[in-house]
């Protein structure tokens, strides 16, 4: 950092937290560096979203020559798991763990599933397009492989994001929870912007080998980001206390019925669903 940058940082820090974005979301128990580290799971989600919706959308159609209708179908596959986010969040709320963790096991599984999808994705796409050495491979292998890859990435990112936001609200004080969630989504946007710039730079000029390198690097980055984000975040409760709390919790159907008894629930869900589409 040069001398001018140091002076700018000192001046900005001297203005107080009122001029620092989301500085008021931090508390003595949850300082801003810890919050920013936790938000790295959103960076991994943003990276996956940009890769699926933006980068591969263009690469599959232009460079690999895959029909646009098939590309649209593949990109829509991760949305299949979106309605299950309520169930995923409920299961993490009531998870029985002798280790005393509720959120960590689900985020670990989500990160591993997302990693698996990204790991097989470039090879499946090359077989699907029939380029280079994959020219003689049966197309159905590429179809099944690409569909499985997109489904795995979708399941992983939905699980990671749902449980990660639940963990953030667990750690934050009640009055600062809206600000913490806002910070998480700002980091999601940051991850999307940074990933878009990185993918664009790394894939120019395009080659099949470079596509494999970039997507598998994204798979490794997913594990690293989520590992750093989770490190010593969720406190461990006594196993017996966690089991007792889980045993006394209502079932998902009962919790869903209680939720739907509120006013205009169906209208709100339809609005969110249509807005997402």
Give the residues covered by each predicted segment.
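Membrane-embedded alpha-helical bundles of multi-pass transporters/translocases
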Residues: 2-243, 251-277
């Amino acid at each position: 950092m040069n001398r001018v940058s140091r002076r700018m940082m000192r001046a900005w820090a001297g203005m107080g937290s009122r001029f620092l974005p989301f500085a008021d979301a931090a508390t003595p128990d949850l300082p801003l560096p810890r919050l920013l580290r936790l938000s790295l799971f959103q960076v991994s989600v943003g990276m996956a979203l940009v890769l699926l919706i933006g980068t591969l959308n263009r690469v599959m159609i232009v460079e690999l020559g895959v029909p646009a209708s098939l590309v649209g179908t593949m990109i829509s596959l991760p949305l299949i798991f979106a309605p299950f986010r309520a169930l995923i969040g409920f299961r993490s709320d009531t998870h029985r763990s002798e280790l005393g963790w509720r959120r960590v096991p689900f985020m670990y599984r989500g990160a591993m599933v997302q990693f698996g999808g990204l790991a097989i994705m470039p090879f499946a796409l090359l077989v699907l397009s029939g380029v280079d050495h994959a020219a003689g491979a049966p197309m159905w292998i590429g179809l099944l492989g690409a569909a499985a890859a997109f489904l795995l990435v979708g399941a992983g990112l939905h699980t990671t994001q749902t449980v990660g936001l639940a963990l953030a609200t667990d750690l934050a004080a009640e009055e600062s929870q809206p600000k913490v969630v806002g910070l998480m989504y700002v980091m999601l946007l940051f991850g999307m912007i940074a990933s878009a710039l990185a993918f664009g730079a790394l894939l120019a000029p395009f080659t099949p080998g470079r596509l494999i390198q970039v997507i598998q690097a994204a798979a490794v980055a997913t594990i690293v980001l989520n590992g750093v984000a989770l490190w010593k975040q969720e406190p461990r409760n006594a196993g017996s206390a966690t089991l007792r709390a889980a045993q006394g919790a209502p079932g998902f159907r009962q919790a869903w019925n209680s939720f739907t008894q509120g006013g205009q629930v169906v209208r709100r869900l339809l609005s969110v669903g249509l807005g997402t589409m």
